[in-house]
């Protein structure tokens, strides 16, 4: 497998294997990793991960596990056995849940995926948090959950680029994975707390998840190359 040379992760947010592979076949695994989320994984199961890995891609399995500690840890173990490069869980599952996931990975031999915690979804603003009983600014909740993740030994966090600078300052060892990235001139779609790729890296993000600006471009390979050029 050729190691990816950029921080770009392209979201394969498609309902079918055929559609996902149609895009993947236009992308260079040296220029990006790929993200498999709930829709595609539910449709295709582990086969899509194996297929993408055979095409040379490192895979971020974005299923945001959130359950009791043992159940979540076993799901993370299963993901590791698929050979994924990165897997995530919801930090709101708590310290014991995240620590159980860390422990199960450390008990394995061989390569371990990066274990990433999800703080506050980038679609959520203060009014959304208030609706679920958290009448606080999203960044406050992000910092609370980040502290738990650090204590549990997580490798990093999924966060908005707008939270990246504060998180790097508070937790410099955590790798930051940022969705909601939109190259200049792109539509915001349903993401709210967004920055451009260059802005996100400058703010402290380590990996950038980009979906529709590449997947729905007339020429996805050209769109990916433009993002990589922006980061050079």
Curated annotation (Swiss-Prot):
Active-site residues, Swiss-Prot/TrEMBL: 64 (proton donor)
Family annotation (SMART domains): OMPdecase
Enzyme Commission number: 4.1.1.23
Keywords: Decarboxylase, Lyase, Pyrimidine biosynthesis
UniProt pathway: Pyrimidine metabolism; UMP biosynthesis via de novo pathway; UMP from orotate: step 2/2
CC terms in the record's Gene Ontology section: cytosol
Residues binding substrate, per UniProt: 13, 35, 62-71, 122, 182, 191, 211-212
GO molecular function: orotidine-5'-phosphate decarboxylase activity
Any one biological process term the GO annotation gives: 'de novo' pyrimidine nucleobase biosynthetic process
Gene3D superfamilies listed in its UniProt record: Aldolase class I (3.20.20.70)
InterPro entries xrefs: Aldolase_TIM (IPR013785), OMPdecase (IPR014732), OMPdecase_AS (IPR018089), OMPdecase_bac (IPR047596), OMPdeCOase_dom (IPR001754), RibuloseP-bd_barrel (IPR011060)
Catalytic activities: orotidine 5'-phosphate + H(+) = UMP + CO2
Domain of life: Bacteria
Record note on quaternary structure: Homodimer.
Function: Catalyzes the decarboxylation of orotidine 5'-monophosphate (OMP) to uridine 5'-monophosphate (UMP).
HAMAP family reported for this sequence: OMPdecase_type1_B (MF_01200_B)
NCBIfam families in the cross-refs: PRK00230.1, pyrF
Similarity comment: Belongs to the OMP decarboxylase family. Type 1 subfamily.
Name by which UniProt lists this protein: Orotidine 5'-phosphate decarboxylase
Species annotation: Pseudomonas syringae pv. syringae (strain B728a)
């Amino acid at each position: 497998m050729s190691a990816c040379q950029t921080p770009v992760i392209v979201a394969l947010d498609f309902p079918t294997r055929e559609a996902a592979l149609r895009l993947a076949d236009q992308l260079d695994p040296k220029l990006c990793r790929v993200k498999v989320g709930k829709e595609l994984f539910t449709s295709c199961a582990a086969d899509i991960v194996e297929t993408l890995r055979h095409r040379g891609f490192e895979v971020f399995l974005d299923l945001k596990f959130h359950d009791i500690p043992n159940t979540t840890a076993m799901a993370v173990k299963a993901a590791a056995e698929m050979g994924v490069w990165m897997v995530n869980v919801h930090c709101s599952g708590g310290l014991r849940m995240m620590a159980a996931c860390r422990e199960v990975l450390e008990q394995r031999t061989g390569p371990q995926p990066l274990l990433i915690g999800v703080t506050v979804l980038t679609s959520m603003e203060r009014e959304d948090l208030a609706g679920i009983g958290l009448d606080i600014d999203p960044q406050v909740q992000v910092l609370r959950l980040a502290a738990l993740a650090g204590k549990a030994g997580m490798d990093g966090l999924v966060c908005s680029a707008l939270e990246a600078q504060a998180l790097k300052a508070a937790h410099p060892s955590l790798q930051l994975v940022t969705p909601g990235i939109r190259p200049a001139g792109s539509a915001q779609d349903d993401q709210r707390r967004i920055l451009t790729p260059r802005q996100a890296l400058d703010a402290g993000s380590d990996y950038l998840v980009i979906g529709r600006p590449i997947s729905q471009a007339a020429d996805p390979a050209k769109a990916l190359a433009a993002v990589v050029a922006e980061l050079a």
